[in-house]
A protein has these predicted regions:
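Non-catalytic C-terminal accessory modules of carbohydrate-active enzymes
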Residues: 1-157
């Protein structure tokens, strides 16, 4: 859905509205992109961003959010074999991407094809990426520049 109608029964005798798009019906789209896909600003005007998806039992999530620098796009695939979070962020933007810790299942995590986490330890292999403090639910990575960023968590089993 690219446009959310103010009412679904437009032009019916029982509906008194008259526009095809209204701000308050955009709430679900905002909630899905901000909380399920996890795309949110860390600073005013989206100067920095955070991507922290809340996957639950979903097997895929795809979202994009406009910001002053351009579009932030997220595509997530979650299978029993691996977890993939692909993000496209405008060049020059800094932010944090959080990889969910789905139990204790990752044998390794790669970023853009380079191993960055193995044997339960972070490997500082990319100059534009750092592990930053998180919690028991996420591994948080500070990304120092935009572009295409792909995290792949390969499952132990």
């Amino acid at each position: 859905i690219s446009t959310l109608w103010e009412g679904w029964e437009l032009n019916s005798a029982t509906y008194g509205g008259g526009t095809y798009n209204h701000g308050w019906t955009g709430g679900p789209a905002t909630l899905l992109s901000q909380y399920v896909a996890g795309i949110s600003p860390l600073a005013n005007g989206f100067k920095t961003y955070k991507i922290q998806p809340q996957i639950g039992l979903l097997t895929s999530i795809k979202a994009q959010v406009p910001c002053p620098a351009g579009l932030i796009k997220v595509n997530i695939q979650n299978t029993p074999q691996q977890f993939t979070l692909s993000a496209e962020v405008p060049i020059g933007m800094q932010g944090v991407i959080s990889v969910p810790i789905l139990a204790d299942i990752y044998s390794e995590i790669t970023c853009n094809g380079t191993v960055i986490f193995a044997n339960d330890k972070y490997i500082n292999a990319l100059p534009w990426l750092d592990l930053v403090p998180g919690n028991e639910h996420y591994l948080n990575f500070e990304v120092k520049n935009g572009g295409k960023i792909v995290f792949v968590g390969k499952n132990r089993k």
